[in-house]
Amino acid sequence: MAASGWARAAVIFLCACDLLLLLLLPPRAFATEGPAETPGEATPPPRKKKKDIRDYNDADMARLLEQWEKDDDIEEGDLPEHKRPSAPIDFSQIDPGKPESILKMTKKGKTLMMFVTVSGNPTEKETEEITSLWQGSLFNANYDVQRFIVGSDRAIFMLRDGGYAWEIKDFLVSQDRCADVTLEGQVYPGKGGGSKEKNQTKQEKGKKKKERDLKPRASKEDNRAGSKKEEL
């Protein structure tokens, strides 16, 4: 009986020691213990460290922006022009007798450029001042136009909405110092380009008069030469 009592006491003591160890040891000590890896199994690759945003270069920023564009719904107006859906064409508003009406509809919402020539052989500074006044007038009329000087007498007017290009063209050609406007390959003479055309017509008329005067003189000389031959 005494031996069995001592055995029970020893078992109870051992159980108490195990419980104390479980309570005192941290849980990580048990988490690290796991089944041994088999020789055929490969260890998973270490997780790639995330790059600090302060160390991003241009390529990283471009990839990040592209990812944001994929994840977020971007408004149609913020999309690049080549990604925007083309505006539907209302064929009821197209006049078959006016080709410009078709171009207005097809260029609506698209960027468009036109070339403007200033008359009077101006300097680049004068062209800058004159075209700046034209741009200001268009801005006051709620037209979004950007201007770039490309020569001593030439400038580019760029529109974000090409549907208004022909209205702006009509305004420009009515200005006193506008020689011409080139839009979609078509040259439209301006109010300031009339003097050149008048000079050209005067020169052409003068040439025609000279040709007319030379013809009777040549015929008279031919007649004189013929009469001399007859006398001989």
Curated annotation (Swiss-Prot):
Glycan attachment residues as annotated in the record: 199
InterPro entries linked to this entry: MESD
Biased composition (Basic and acidic residues): 194-204, 211-232
Region (Disordered) location: 32-54, 185-232
Ranges annotated as biased composition (Low complexity): 32-41
Signal sequence region: 1-31
UniProt short sequence motif Prevents secretion from ER, positions renumbered to this chain: 229-232
Domain notes per entry: The chaperone domain provides a folding template for proper folding of the beta-propeller (BP) domains of LRP5/6.
Task of the protein: Chaperone specifically assisting the folding of beta-propeller/EGF modules within the family of low-density lipoprotein receptors (LDLRs). Acts as a modulator of the Wnt pathway through chaperoning the coreceptors of the canonical Wnt pathway, LRP5 and LRP6, to the plasma membrane. Essential for specification of embryonic polarity and mesoderm induction. Plays an essential role in neuromuscular junction (NMJ) formation by promoting cell-surface expression of LRP4. May regulate phagocytosis of apoptotic retinal pigment epithelium (RPE) cells.
Subunit structure: Monomer. Interacts with LRP5; the interaction prevents LRP5 from forming aggregates and chaperones LRP6 to the plasma membrane. Interacts with LRP6; the interaction prevents LRP6 from forming aggregates and chaperones LRP6 to the plasma membrane. Interacts with LRP4; the interaction promotes glycosylation of LRP4 and its cell-surface expression.
Name used for this protein in its record: LRP chaperone MESD
Organism in which the protein naturally occurs: Bos taurus
